[in-house]
Structure formats: structure tokens, C-alpha cells
């Protein structure tokens, strides 16, 4: 039965300027891997998540077993497989190596059966082909391969090496501490970065009780928000920050370039906006200098009045 799948990798704080891109790539890599292996229904939808301490993806309508697939192997030219005396020794050896020796003496023009040999032209010569039916992969194997590929292809700015408690050395963007993989209510026992998957996730570093057990894949996001004080969606967290900045500005104009909003979104898991201020005397400094240092050094949001001049208030998240 097709069910929702969630995969989450919990880490130390990831590079904020790369977080959004890492989250999107992680989700896209797992989705494409599962789709290529036949685990997704046509209506399956993948949603990416990224917070300072996690990369995750949720995929709807994931099959527990991929469908059986037809495999076509191009074996050898007909002239090498058959001569005047019948089937050649080379062809028999080839079929034995494929575990299909019983088909070596079959007609090369067979037209039915799940496993069969047949002759077809490749446009230049006639070849012997083997058609076989490969059993579909189980999800644990398909996800294990897809997860490994997705991690390997992540656009990580700079890898770091770290040691796990068992002494093994791992390379990743930041140390990874936990892997969650749930298909419906079931744990998918995959492994990555020397971690074995379970159903435990990490809540907010300060505002939650820490470890949180997740009952089902669909419960992951709401449980993380309600009990873990973590908004997992990068887009939802960003939208909340923008909305709260506008409210806190109290009629002033918030100077919030997109790259600053994205960076701040990548620095917090449960955003809350505060108002700060500085001595009016500092407004004698060119406002461009003040805005630059607030944005680049403090990640603050400067405020401007109706006249466009800088105020001595600022907002921080």
C-alpha cells in the first residue's frame, strides 16, 4: 500500500547561506532516486524542508515494493551464438554466466515466456537478446541507494571530517547526529553517514525537551512544530519572519533585502522578532554605513521613516 515517506537528517548548524539550496537538493535527489526505481505513484509529491539543524523531505504515495520490471540484455551477434551445428559454446557460457543456461538450447526465435531469448536487428546486424523480468526492489534497498546518491550530490560548499563515537571518520557539511526514515508507521531501516534510521527527531535546541518520537510519517511536521518548537519548512519560516517584521515595524519601512531574509531564515528554527535601538547621535554617521553594518555584521533589519531616513530603531529575529 502506498503511504507517505519522510526522511530527515539531523545535524549541527548547517552553513546558513547554503541551507536553502542544500534542502532543495536533498529532497530532489531522494525524489528522483525513488522515481527512477519505480517507487512513486504518478500523483506523488515531494516537499523539501531545511532548518539550521536538519535537512528533510516528505514524499506522498510511496510504494513499499517497486513494480517488476522488464530487462532487455543485448547478448551477442547471431553468427557468434549459432552456427551450422547449432548453439555455440560461447553462447552456452554466456547464458550460464547469466544463470539462464536452460535457455541456451531454446529456440532463438521464442516469442513468449517471462524469460526468453530472441533475435532482433540493431540496424547493423542481427543480435541475440535476452528478455527477463526483474523482481521489484523493496523500499529499504531503493531508499538506501537513493539516500546515498542524494547525499553524495549535495552542493556542500566545504566538507568537514569528524569522528563518530565508534571511531569511524565521516565527511559531511557538519556533523550528523540522527537519521529518521518513516514509511507510514514503519521505520525504514536504512543507513547513511554511519547512522541507522529510527523514528526519533530532535526538537529546538533550547525550547523543546530534546528528543521527540514520531508516530507516523505524516505526524512528523506537526509534531516537530507542536512539541519541538521547530518550523521545518524554509518557506513557511521565511513567511512568518516577514509578516512579524512588518507588524513590529509599527508603520516604519523595514529594509529587508531577500538575501538577508534568507540568511536569517537559515539561522532560526522558531522565529520571534524583537525591537532594539541605539543612541540618536549615531544617526550623524552616513546611514548607508549604519545599514551595512547592521545587515552584514549583526543580521539586523534597519527601519526607515516616511521620509526615507534611517530611524534609531532596528529589528532582530
Q: Could you say what each language-model-derived stretch is?
A:
Residues 1-300, 304-308:
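Long, basic N-terminal domains or extensions that often function
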Residues 6, 312-317:
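Short hydrophobic beta-strand segments that form the core of ligand-binding sensory/regulatory domains
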Amino acid at each position: 500500500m502506498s503511504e507517505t515517506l519522510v526522511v530527515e537528517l539531523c545535524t549541527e548548524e548547517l552553513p546558513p547561506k547554503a541551507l536553502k539550496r542544500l534542502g532543495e537538493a536533498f529532497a530532489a535527489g531522494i525524489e528522483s532516486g525513488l522515481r527512477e526505481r519505480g517507487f512513486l505513484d504518478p500523483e506523488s509529491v515531494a516537499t523539501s524542508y531545511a532548518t539550521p539543524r536538519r535537512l528533510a523531505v516528505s514524499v506522498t504515495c510511496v510504494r513499499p515494493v517497486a513494480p517488476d520490471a522488464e530487462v532487455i540484455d543485448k547478448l551477442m551477434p547471431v553468427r557468434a551464438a549459432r552456427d551450422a551445428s547449432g548453439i555455440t559454446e560461447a553462447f552456452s557460457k554466456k547464458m550460464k554466466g547469466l544463470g539462464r543456461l536452460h535457455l541456451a538450447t531454446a529456440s532463438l526465435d521464442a516469442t513468449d515466456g517471462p524469460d526468453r531469448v530472441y533475435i532482433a536487428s540493431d540496424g547493423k546486424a542481427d543480435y541475440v537478446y535476452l528478455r527477463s523480468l526483474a523482481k521489484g526492489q523493496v523500499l529499504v534497498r531503493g531508499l538506501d541507494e537513493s539516500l546515498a546518491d542524494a547525499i553524495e550530490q549535495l552542493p556542500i560548499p566545504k566538507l568537514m571530517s569528524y569522528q563518530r563515537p565508534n571511531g569511524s571518520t565521516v565527511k559531511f557539511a557538519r556533523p550528523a547526529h540522527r537519521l529518521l526514515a518513516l514509511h507510514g508507521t514503519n521505520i525504514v531501516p536504512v543507513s547513511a553517514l554511519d547512522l541507522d534510521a529510527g523514528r526519533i527527531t530532535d526538537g529546538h535546541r533550547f525550547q523543546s525537551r530534546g528528543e521527540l518520537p514520531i508516530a507516523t510519517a505524516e505526524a512528523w511536521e506537526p509534531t516537530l512544530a507542536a512539541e519541538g518548537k521547530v518550523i521545518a519548512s524554509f518557506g513557511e519560516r521565511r513567511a512568518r519572519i516577514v509578516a512579524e517584521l512588518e507588524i513590529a515595524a509599527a508603520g516604519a519601512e523595514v529594509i529587508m533585502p531577500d538575501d538577508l531574509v534568507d540568511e536569517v531564515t537559515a539561522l532560526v528554527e522558531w522565529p520571534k522578532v524583537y525591537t532594539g535601538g541605539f543612541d540618536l547621535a549615531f544617526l550623524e554617521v552616513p546611514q548607508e554605513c549604519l545599514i551595512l553594518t547592521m545587515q552584514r555584521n549583526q543580521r539586523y533589519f534597519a527601519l526607515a521613516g516616511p521620509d526615507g531616513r534611517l530611524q534609531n530603531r532596528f529589528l532582530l529575529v
